Amino acid sequence: MVETIEKATLLEKVQSAYEQLNTLLASLSEEQKTTPGVNSSWSVKDNLAHITAWQDLLPARIQSWIAGKPPAEFLPEFKTEDEVNEYLYQQHKDRPLPEVEAAFQSSYRRALAAVESVSEEALNTPVKSKNESRSAPLWRYINGEICEHYEEHGNMIRRWLGV
């Protein structure tokens, strides 16, 4: 049996995750946001650029799933997610903090609009990615790409801060 969710509940989860991450980010100085070491050589800024790069894919992925197709593979020339993440880090590490922060905010608004445009029925329809044998409801992918991703990186930042 497929686990379902009400659209309003998913939107609340997404907005709550966003607010929690933003609250954490707002509590940090520019120096804290740009100092390496959060996870390996990544700074808070690098984590934010990483989240943004993956989040930017979500609207197109949602449209693919709704159309009944698995989304195109992101950067298929790389064999592992770690290789993709390293590539993204190298692409964004020299971007200025204000640019990364603005890109994150814009990306979130686009992702939220994409989620808002999906019907509750579609959110609860099983879908799968290209390399997966099992399917899950669309809302689970959205939850993972936004809520769980924010939580994962927020926790890394908190551990680094010692809080």
Question: Model-derived features: where do they sit?
Answer:
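Hydrophobic alpha-helical core bundles mediating ligand binding, dimerization, or RNAP-core interactions
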Residues: 14, 18-21, 25, 58, ...
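A short, mixed-charge helix-start or loop-turn motif at secondary-structure junctions
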Residues: 3-7, 90-94, 135-139
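Surface-exposed helix-capping loop/turn segments at secondary-structure junctions
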Residues: 26-33, 116-124, 163
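Short, flexible active-site loop motifs that bind/organize anionic cofactors or intermediates
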Residues: 23, 37, 90, 113, ...
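Extreme N-terminal tail/first-helix region
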Residues: 1-20
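Acidic/histidine-rich alpha-helical segments that form the ligand environment
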Residues: 13, 83-124
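Short, contiguous alpha-helical
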Residues: 34-83, 124-163
